[in-house]
């Protein structure tokens, strides 16, 4: 999108935020992530990056239904080193688009071992002076995608056009979320994991192939060493459902995010049970 000046961009962002009932900061963050994603799609590395995580979920269900502040990707065809990733992102930042935004790499660091996927975290800045937005991109490698990544058509926030990017298929997105919920059990402190499973299945469940989801979950648990959840899920879900701590965390989450306010913790637990029963029975 071409704007006359930063103030006009802020006005567009403010209007979109009001329309979507989310904060202007979230819209600005997602707009800048979209600008980066388009650069990836136009770079020589288009077929090396595979989109996953919250930004993909937001694209699937809608920004007004799920917002995120960072970009999660997996990369193929490269050895994951600080030097390689810095070179790749420096080249991506140099891709010129008529959107008035300039990107710079601020830093490269390792993702903590305690996170879902060990990998590399890239800190960037998106600049449209005086606007400066810090961005984070997490890059992993060797992820288990079942059966394979797909070509995803990404609709832009303000322009009536799309970009094409490689992404996780729906079944792999759901499989990873289900594994996270079940393996972490009551130690999970992220209500958004429950929300993501619920909203993905509510809005896109009819498109989900149960046999593929079953296989994706099997392969994900094999990779993460959590195969016991496939048989123990009824007991795990009972423990989760009865957890006062998780219920309170959910209630706080649903108060903070307008899109979750009409969904109860019971709803999310019932959705997870429904999916697991459908693919495991």
Residue positions per predicted region:
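Structured mid-to-C-terminal alpha-helical surface segments
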Residues: 1-49, 59-67, 71-281
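Catalytic metal-binding/acid-base residues of hydrolase active sites
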Residues: 56
């Amino acid at each position: 999108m071409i704007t006359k000046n930063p103030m006009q961009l802020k006005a567009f962002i403010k209007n979109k935020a009001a329309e979507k009932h989310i904060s202007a900061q979230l819209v600005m963050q997602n707009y800048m992530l979209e600008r980066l994603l388009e650069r990836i799609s136009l770079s020589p590395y288009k077929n090396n990056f595979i989109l996953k995580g919250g930004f993909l979920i937001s694209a699937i269900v809608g920004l007004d239904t799920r917002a995120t502040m960072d970009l999660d990707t997996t990369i193929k065809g490269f050895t994951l080193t600080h030097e390689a990733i810095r070179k790749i992102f420096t080249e991506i930042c140099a891709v010129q688009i008529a959107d008035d935004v300039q990107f710079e790499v601020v830093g490269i660091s390792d993702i903590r071992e305690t996170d879902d996927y060990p990998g590399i975290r890239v800190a960037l800045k998106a600049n449209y002076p005086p606007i400066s937005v810090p961005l984070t991109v997490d890059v992993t490698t060797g992820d288990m995608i079942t059966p394979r990544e797909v070509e995803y058509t990404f609709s832009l926030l303000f322009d009536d056009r799309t970009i094409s990017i490689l992404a996780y298929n729906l079944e792999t997105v759901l499989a990873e979320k289900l594994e996270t919920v079940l393996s972490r059990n009551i130690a999970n402190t992220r209500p958004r994991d429950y929300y993501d499973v619920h909203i993905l299945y509510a809005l896109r469940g009819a498109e989900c192939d149960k046999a593929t989801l079953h296989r994706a979950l099997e392969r994900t648990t094999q990779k993460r060493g959590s195969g016991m959840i496939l048989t123990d899920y009824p007991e795990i879900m009972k423990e989760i459902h009865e957890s006062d701590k998780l219920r309170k965390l959910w209630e706080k989450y649903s108060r903070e995010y307008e899109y979750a306010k009409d969904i109860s913790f019971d709803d999310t637990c019932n959705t997870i049970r429904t999916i697991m029963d459908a693919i495991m029975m």
